[in-house]
């Protein structure tokens, strides 16, 4: 029986540094792939519910649904997918695409979505930035970023998803009136997010400039959120609406 080797933190740090030093590594990514074994149900789910898994490149995400005219929500980094599945169950009038690079998370998400018989959820193993670039402008109703890697070390700040360059791309793809919803339990990243987002002229802070949004009841609690609460961390939600181009 083969065993999947899981990288230590030190090994990940070394890999990140080596990637940054490669001359051909021009694109800064916001994620690192981490290996982990699949359980039996996850392995079978990848085959049984493969119709829920999109293969990159995918083009316009809306075309992969039975009702492409329904509002589209894109979640970037859905972890194990429980909250994404719950949202798709609660909102059959919307289409959901989850983008994740952690294979066990993808497998668990399609297992739960498949068992629930969901038709309005698809998942994708890809770099979210590349996926967004290939989407038509003004085509997404909501982009969700829940408890992303805060990249705590200063030299890794460029990897944070919420920076001006990446938010410009998000704005281009959001339809007018569409929203960007982020949540984090890491206070320094929350302050960073607010500083970036409050200074985007095309976005309006629905909680008022300088404020975080009251925790929405409709956002299911995630595993990372529970861990943050158990550690005594404050949970910050930010919802920004596109008001211009």
Curated annotation (Swiss-Prot):
The residues listed in the UniProt record as binding substrate, with positions renumbered to this chain, are 153, 185, 222-225
Q: Which PROSITE patterns does this chain map to?
A: SAM_MT_TRMB (PS51625)
Annotated catalysed reactions = guanosine(46) in tRNA + S-adenosyl-L-methionine = N(7)-methylguanosine(46) in tRNA + S-adenosyl-L-homocysteine
Pathway the protein contributes to: tRNA modification; N(7)-methylguanine-tRNA biosynthesis
Q: Where does S-adenosyl-L-methionine bind?
A: 75, 100, 127, 149
EC nos: 2.1.1.33
Read off the InterPro entries from this record: SAM-dependent_MTases_sf (IPR029063), tRNA_(Gua-N-7)_MeTrfase_Trmb (IPR003358), tRNA_methyltr_TrmB_bact (IPR055361)
Question: Keywords of this protein's UniProt record, alphabetized?
Answer: Methyltransferase, S-adenosyl-L-methionine, Transferase, tRNA processing
> What superkingdom heads the lineage?
Bacteria
**tRNA processing among the record's keywords?**
yes
**One GO MF term attached to the UniProt entry:** tRNA (guanine(46)-N7)-methyltransferase activity
Q: Main role? A: Catalyzes the formation of N(7)-methylguanine at position 46 (m7G46) in tRNA.
Q: Which PANTHER family match?
A: 3-DEOXY-D-MANNO-OCTULOSONIC-ACID TRANSFERASE/TRNA GUANINE-N 7 - -METHYLTRANSFERASE (PTHR23417), PENTACOTRIPEPTIDE-REPEAT REGION OF PRORP DOMAIN-CONTAINING PROTEIN (PTHR23417:SF14)
Family named by the database record: Belongs to the class I-like SAM-binding methyltransferase superfamily. TrmB family.
The protein depicted here goes by the name: tRNA (guanine-N(7)-)-methyltransferase
């Amino acid at each position: 029986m083969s065993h999947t080797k899981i990288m230590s933190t030190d090994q990940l740090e070394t890999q990140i540094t080596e990637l940054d030093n490669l001359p051909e590594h021009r694109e800064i990514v916001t994620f690192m792939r981490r290996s982990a074994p699949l359980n039996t149900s996850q392995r079978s789910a990848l085959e049984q519910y493969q119709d829920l898994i999109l293969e990159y490149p995918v083009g316009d995400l809306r075309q992969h649904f039975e009702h492409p005219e329904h509002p589209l929500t894109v979640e970037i980094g859905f972890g194990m997918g429980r909250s994404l599945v719950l949202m798709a169950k609660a909102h059959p009038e919307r289409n959901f695409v989850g983008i994740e690079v952690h294979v066990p998370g993808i497998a668990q998400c399609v297992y739960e979505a498949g068992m629930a018989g969901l038709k309005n959820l698809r998942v994708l193993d890809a770099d979210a930035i590349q996926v967004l670039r290939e989407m038509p402008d003004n085509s997404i109703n909501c982009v969700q970023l829940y408890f992303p890697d805060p990249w705590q070390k200063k030299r890794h700040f460029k990897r944070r998803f919420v920076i001006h360059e990446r938010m410009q791309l998000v704005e281009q793809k959001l339809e007018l009136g569409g929203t960007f919803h982020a949540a984090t339990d890491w206070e320094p990243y929350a302050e960073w997010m607010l500083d970036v987002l409050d200074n985007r002229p095309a976005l309006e802070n629905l909680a008022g400039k300088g404020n975080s949004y009251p925790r929405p009841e409709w956002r299911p609690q995630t595993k990372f959120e529970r861990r943050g609460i158990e550690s005594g961390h404050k949970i910050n939600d930010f919802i920004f609406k596109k008001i211009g181009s």
